[in-house]
Amino acid sequence: MSNVPTNESGYDVIAEVVQRYVDGAKSGRGEDMKPAFHKDATVFGYIGADLFAGPIQQLFDWNDENGPATGLQARIASIDVIDTVATVRLELDNWTGHRFTDLFTVLKVDGEWKIINKVFHLHS
């Protein structure tokens, strides 16, 4: 069960932030997804046996290297909001032929919702 508010301060604004990330994935340009993330955000997950971890710039670079994912399908599975903190589960199909589950920690910083951390699972 998830808490999915339908007001401007919650779900709708957070969904827009996540959509910026998805739009960047579709365009294949890290710069397009960058506004969704806090400047100090991090990313963690495995690609095969290799840990993909560190500053969010690594994700932007990976996205640039892999190019557009025009066939990408994304669905927000859940959003849970507690005042200035939120978590989001995003299901992604056909990102460069792969399926991912992303888990985001989102924080309201200076009045703006920003992704602080992305942890992902690459489905086999």
Region spans (language model):
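Short, low-complexity N-terminal intrinsically disordered segments enriched in polar/charged residues
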Residues: M1-E31, P35-K39, F52
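Surface-exposed, charged secondary-structure patches
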Residues: T6-V13, T42-R99
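Generic secondary-structure microfeatures
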Residues: F37, G45-I47, K108
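Short beta-strand segments enriched in hydrophobic/aromatic residues
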Residues: F37, L92-N94, V119-F120
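Beta-strand-connecting loop/turn residues
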Residues: K39, T84, G111-E112
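Short secondary-structure capping/turn micro-motifs that flank functional sites
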Residues: A41-T42, S124
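Short beta-strand edge/turn micro-motifs at domain boundaries
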Residues: R99-S124
